[in-house]
């Protein structure tokens, strides 16, 4: 079996042509150190803390965006933890999300050309923010480097589920460094995002416009299969049946993400070492996020 088959999808980190991938999901948290420790408790190997910045149009030094991050980088995609660093629009947006609840509030889709995606979204009727060039300093084994991204964002409120964005990675080697890709829990790929919504039909139509991909029926809702990864939009009742341990804090709710792992036994052992509970759900393992990462759950599945 090839690695592409074992991971179930495209054996490539970044998209080509018209492909669109589920690139990463983001936890919004109040305490960056506690959240980083929580990732480690769950068996991930988190990257060092990084403060995000944007180029100054006037040519001065980079300006803080208002957020910083730590990540769990995977062989395919990643999990991000974001925290506030400055009083900026992005920092205030994070505060508003935290007022609802800590947890998943961001989903980023990767494309080969974020500028083209920006034009497509505007043509599809979305109110858009200006295209953003973002960067953050990273350390590599060769020395300091910069991770750079081009990001297309809709105006806040256009996608009520959270910060939905489409981006293009400019520096794959700086972002996906081999030393950060091995995790004690065997995590290999981000595979899915599940969102509870009040009106599945409305949300599915909107996500179809946002992704450029069709929605199909799934248990309790609609699912959009991307070229890598998927987004499921389900009723609160369907979400509750699948995740009875989670109380939905408010709707809409980004409540769970799927992670492909080397083995369920391996991730179960890693969670146990971290003092975290999990339950078997058929061929899956469901584990609530540690409190420092907010409200929600991981759904771990073994690579076939």
Task: Give short role names for the model-derived ranges.
Residues 46-54:
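A short beta-strand-loop structural module common to alpha/beta enzyme folds
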Residues 54-64:
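Short, flexible/disordered intra-domain loops and linkers
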